[in-house]
Amino acid sequence: MPSFDKPTDQQEATRDAQGADSRAATEVALFEAFGGVRGMVETTVPGLVFVAIYTVKRDIHIAAIAALGLSLLLGIARLVRKDTLKHAFSGVFGVAFGAVFAMMSGDAKNFYLPGMLYTLGLAVGYIVSALAGYPLMGLILGPVFKENLSWRTRNPGRKVAYTKASWAWGLILLAKSAVLFPLYWWGDVTQLGWVKVALGIPPMLLSVYLTWIFLSKAPPPIDVFAEMEAAERAEREREATAR
């Protein structure tokens, strides 16, 4: 009869340690990819400044310039701290685009339109990529985990997790868009601005949390860079032996 030995305490401890390491690595990778809580705050605060100043002053130019100036200061602070450049510049460019669009059009609501269109496009991208078998979350996080596209063919459990995460991001961002666009069309700028600020951090936190849940339960990533380095070392050793 086959033996069904229970795992030893040492084996269970090893598995628990491996699981904890995997969860910690996933958490670090997610914070690196999405800028952490600080990145979420930085994308929300300029919009808060814009709607607050516009509510009081009713001046598009003052509100837009103030929001852009704050975004620039936040970007410079990231550069001084030697943080990732993509987080330093992405927020600045987004706010600058919205500020210019609002001032040129003369409609304060257009300050938020570029970001809303980006959110909607991102939602569609997540959903379409998941349906196509190339989940966008895998394309984003694969290089961070040093697995590149190995999850598509060699690690099906990771592909399932990335697909679930992409669906989560897509549906959450789609729901956010379903709230904001009616306000853009039929509400006033104050309503749109405050609701957009309120919907800035919670949906992203929920999306990141669900992604963490899916990936922490998935198999560990295959480090393709380590594999290539090992293959190169083996090749050098064979050449040295041949000499």
Task: Label the predicted regions.
Residues A17-E32, V45-V56, L72-K82, A161:
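Short juxtamembrane and helix-loop transition motifs at transmembrane-helix boundaries
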